[in-house]
Amino acid sequence: MFAELAEVAAAQLGPYPSLPGPELRRAARAAMGVLDLAAGDVRVERSWTDGDLAGEELSWSVGFGPRTHAYLLRPRDAAGPLPGVVALHCHGGMKWVGKEKIADGPSVPSPGPSLEVQRVRERLYGGRAYANELARRGFVVLAPDVLTWGSRRFPLGVDEPGPYDAAARDHEHVVAKYCAALGTSFAGVAAGEDLAAAAYLRSRPDVGTVGCVGLSGGGLRAALLGAFDPDMRAVVVAAMVSSYRDMIDGYVEKHTWMLWPPGLPRLGDWPDLVAARAPEPLMVQYALRDELFPEPGMRRAHTMIEERYREAPDAYEAVWADVPHSFDVTRQEQAFDWLAQRLKA
C-alpha cells in the first residue's frame, strides 16, 4: 500500500525538488518551525580534572522544561582560544541519558559509565567516550543533552533506564504530535536547542571557530546545525545520510520522527538539506553495512552532495567504510584529523 501511495504522491505533489542551497535553508527552517532559543542563565554545576583534561558540567534554560545539562571538556593546560566542537549524542534507542553516551563526566573512573552506556559505546563508538578524546586533541568540546534525552527527558513515571527507554519509544509519537500541533516539529525544537548550545559555545572567550559532529541521530542534529547556523565552520555527519526516496521501502519505520519533519520533502530530499551549506566544509561518513540505510540511498546521496559541491569539491569529504551503523575509532580519528584541518587553519 505504501508503494502505491508513493506513486500517487509523486505524481500529484512532485516531492524532492532541487532548490538552491540558500533558498532551501530558509524554506526548510520555516517548514520545520525551528525555534529561536537561547541558552539563558548558564551555570557551572560542577568542575573537575581528569588527567590532561578539565571539565565542567554546565546547565542552562531554553525557556521551557527542565534545565539543559551539558559537559564542557578542554585540555587542562591549554592557553588562548581553541577551536570548539559541539558533540551531539545519538538516539541509540536510549533516552535515559544523552551526553553520557559520548562523554565522560566527573563520575569517571569511579563508578564509571553504567552498563547500559557501556553497551551503547561498544556497539556504536568503538567502546570509548569520543568527546573526551576529541578534547585531548586540542578542542573545547561541548556535549549537550537535547529534548527528550537525559536532563531534558519527560517524567514518564518510570525510574529505571530499561523501562524508561521502552516508555520513551512510544512517547516520541506524542512529542511529535504536540510539536506539529504547535506549528513546529520534533526536528525544529531539537535544532533550536542545538543552535542555542552552539551560540553559547561560540560566545566563550576561550573558543575560536566552531564545528560539530554526530553519529546517527547526532549526525542528523549536526546536519541541521550545518544547514541553519551560518557560522558553523565544519560539520561531520556519521551514518545518517541517504536519500528519502530510497528509504520508502522498508526503512521509514526504523527512524526517529526527527528525520521526517513535515513539509521537507516538498522542498528537497534529505541529502539536499545536508549539503545546503555548500561550499562550507562537510564530511559525510557512509557505513556500507548500515542496517538503517540502504546502500543505493547512500550512493544517491553522495552523488547529490557532490553535485551541490561541484564548485568547491575539496570542501566535501566522503568516507566509505565496510562497517555496520557506527562511528568507530578509525572513523573518529578520521573526523578528528579533518576537523583539525578545517578549524585550526
Language-model segments: residues:
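Cap/lid segment of the alpha/beta-hydrolase catalytic domain
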Residues: 90-192, 202, 247-249
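A short loop-to-beta-strand scaffold at the N-terminal edge of the catalytic core in hydrolase folds
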Residues: 55-59, 64-76
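C-terminal catalytic histidine-bearing segment of alpha/beta-hydrolase fold enzymes
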Residues: 309-345
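Mobile cap/lid helix-loop segments that gate and shape the active-site cleft of serine hydrolases
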Residues: 174-184, 196-197, 234-274, 292-302, ...
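Short beta-strand element of the alpha/beta-hydrolase
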Residues: 70, 80-92
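N-terminal targeting or regulatory segments adjacent to alpha/beta-hydrolase or S9 domains
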Residues: 1-56, 62, 98, 137, ...
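Short beta-strand/loop motif that positions the catalytic acidic residue
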Residues: 277, 284-286
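Alpha/beta-hydrolase fold nucleophile elbow
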Residues: 205-216
